[in-house]
Amino acid sequence: MQIALLCEDLNRQSELEAIATRWGLTHDEDNVFALVLTTQQLELRKRDEPKLGAIFVDLVSGAVAHRRKFGGGKGQSIAKAVGLNKGATPLVLDGTAGLGRDAFVLASLGCKVQMVERHPVVAALLDDGLSRAKHDADIGGWVSQRMSLLHASSHDALEQLMAQDDFVQPDVVYLDPMYPHPENKKKSALVKKEMRVFQSLVGADNDADALLAPALLMATKRVVVKRPDYAEWLDNQKPSMAIETKKNRFDVYVNAGMKS
């Protein structure tokens, strides 16, 4: 994929080149999107809209850290959806990892989470944020033990993983496909910015429905699909149950009991 590759710390130029090689990125000077390696982090900028600021993965501070400390623990909806409230600590595969926020919440509650992100730029951002979190004195130990990013950034990532001899099937597959956002629905400024940038970078998630069938084959216990409250069921399949929040719901497709 082509994108502008910029390094603001001359001592890290070789790191940027390694990132480009790892994720199949080539430099395009005129691209409206820039992947920028600063002294602190890897970030994405939309060059024609500088006021939007940069997007980067921060699992150590800010909103993610606040949610880890004060977000409700195993009583929160996402925890119930994956079965944490049933005394189990499932192995979770997050098939649409994005910036890693939901995966981080599940990992902070004890789950081992394998993350898959198919878009190479988003995967590069997530990989950088994960690396920084692993080196953090406070959370680095359990992040290193519980969170991993799988190199599967194509449309049939789930099928590819199932074909690998050493792949361990997860108890739960978690999906949060990007969904068109109606103008009349309120979102935070940060989420609006990220959605706007991602939807123009990644494009519409038109094949999201195709994720459900392989996810159901992969998960030994259940598939959890996060949807906006106004969205239809994924692939028009009715879930076994739904857990609703103010703005979203978690559609749960049960393959087996959590303790079976």
Swiss-Prot record:
Transmembrane segments: none
Taxonomic lineage of the native organism: Bacteria, Pseudomonadati, Pseudomonadota, Gammaproteobacteria, Vibrionales
Organism: Aliivibrio salmonicida (strain LFI1238) (Vibrio salmonicida (strain LFI1238))
Protein name in the entry: Ribosomal RNA small subunit methyltransferase J
Gene3D superfamilies: Vaccinia Virus protein VP39, YhiQ-like domain
Catalytic activity: guanosine(1516) in 16S rRNA + S-adenosyl-L-methionine = N(2)-methylguanosine(1516) in 16S rRNA + S-adenosyl-L-homocysteine + H(+)
Keywords from the UniProt entry: Cytoplasm, Methyltransferase, rRNA processing, S-adenosyl-L-methionine, Transferase
Main location as per UniProt: cytoplasm
Chain's gene name: rsmJ
GO cellular component terms, semicolon-separated: cytoplasm
Broad enzyme group: transferase
